[in-house]
Swiss-Prot record:
May function in recognizing stalled ribosomes, interact with stem-loop structures in stalled mRNA molecules, and effect endonucleolytic cleavage of the mRNA. May play a role in the release non-functional ribosomes and degradation of damaged mRNAs. Has endoribonuclease activity. Keywords: Cytoplasm, Endonuclease, Hydrolase, Metal-binding, Nuclease. This is Protein pelota homolog. The N-terminal domain has the RNA-binding Sm fold. It harbors the endoribonuclease activity.
């Protein structure tokens, strides 16, 4: 993410000009933007003139710069788009003011965002800026007969490929093994990841490593091996829990979330220093007992938009109070397993400085 300009405007709002540079950046924006914000950018809009209406031609598409009063935001990771919908607040044609329009924001397209920024939202932008310099990490998990490739993103982990083959003893099965390792090697080479974690149970991953580095010697210095008891999604979770990603990526959102949710559930299991659900967490905040506040991005956005079910709770005040008391706040991605765990706990939890009872 590039932040190109930033200044205060009327009403205490702040306008930031930025350029999303990756799918991760678009995902960050999806959880920063909310109804009532103003988003401005270049777009094309179909304009229907009187003669067009008579002929029912649908009008001509015109390029214009528009400002949208945001009503809805949708992140479409499979089409690499962020859709920002709302009414036109400002543009070069007065006859279009107040009409509905959707900005399709893509990577490397400059836009302006004007809003009342919350501290965690600014932190999220700064995180996206810093992440630009972090390496791309692929996690390959392999055992006899199957291999999987996942890519670590800031919004979660995406599975990029899954391969199977008949392996075992015998010449035919040896051929299947070579084909599996060859397919895995080809896929990893095409990805051009900055770092690769090769994981799995037993000695199969060592055989896979030998095959990969024989075919693609340049990959050897990018590969780190990690022992896990499983492959696929479970194997990836083990890799993250063990901090292997942090060894090659100085800071990763997912590893931090995995560590925090594990700490929370451990404290819950031992009847220790933990709170979950809005009622318990709100009580802990009132006592100044929150060391780490965990909150789900979806829940935070719903509550800020007034569409949630936390009665008489100002979520911005809650977050601000924790920070003023010296606690940390982590906004979890709903796209990954730790976020799913947090959702099952009501979308909010806290690791405490001390027990409340």
């Amino acid at each position: 993410m590039q932040l190109k300009d930033r200044h205060t405007v009327e009403g205490g709002r702040e306008r930031i000009t930025l350029v999303p540079e990756s799918l991760d950046d678009l995902w960050h924006l999806a959880y920063v933007l909310e109804p009532g914000d103003f988003v401005a950018g270049d777009t094309h809009r179909r304009i229907q003139r009187n003669d067009d209406q008579m002929r029912d031609t649908g009008g001509e598409r015109e390029h214009m710069f528009v400002t949208i009063d945001v009503g809805d935001v949708e992140f479409h990771k499979f089409s690499n788009r962020l859709r920002v919908s709302g009414t036109i607040e400002d543009c070069s044609r007065e006859d279009q003011l107040g009409l509905h329009h959707t900005l399709n924001v893509a990577e490397r397209e400059e836009l302006e965002v004007e809003k009342h920024w919350q501290p965690d939202q600014l932190n999220r932008l700064n995180e996206a800026v810093e992440a630009t310099d972090q390496p791309d990490v692929a996690i390959a998990t392999v055992e006899e007969g199957e291999a999987h490739i996942h890519v670590v993103q800031q919004y979660g982990v995406d599975e990029q490929g899954s391969f199977t083959a008949t392996t075992g003893k015998g010449e035919q099965n040896d051929r299947g093994r070579d084909e599996l390792f060859g397919t895995l090697a080809d896929a990893l080479a095409r990805m051009q990841a900055d770092a690769i974690i090769l994981a799995g149970p037993g000695f199969t991953k060592q055989d896979a490593l030998d095959h990969i580095t024989e075919e693609y010697p340049d990959l050897q210095e990018t590969i780190t091996m990690v022992d896990t008891s499983a492959v696929g999604g479970r194997g990836v979770h083990e890799v993250l829990k063990r901090g292997a990603v942090e060894d090659v990526q100085e800071e990763t959102r997912i590893a931090e979330e995995s560590e925090l949710i594990d700490e929370l559930t451990t404290q819950m299991a031992t009847d220790g220093k933990a709170a979950y659900g809005i009622d318990e967490v709100q009580k802990a905040v009132e006592f100044g007992a929150v060391e780490d506040l965990l909150i789900l991005d979806e829940r935070l956005r719903l509550e800020r938009a007034g569409e949630g079910d936390w009665v008489d709770v100002d979520v911005n005040d809650l977050v601000r109070t924790v920070e003023q008391q010296g606690g940390s706040v982590t906004v979890f991605s709903h796209e990954f397993a730790p976020g799913e765990q947090l959702r099952n706990l009501g979308g909010i939890g806290a690791v405490l400085r001390y027990r409340l009872d």
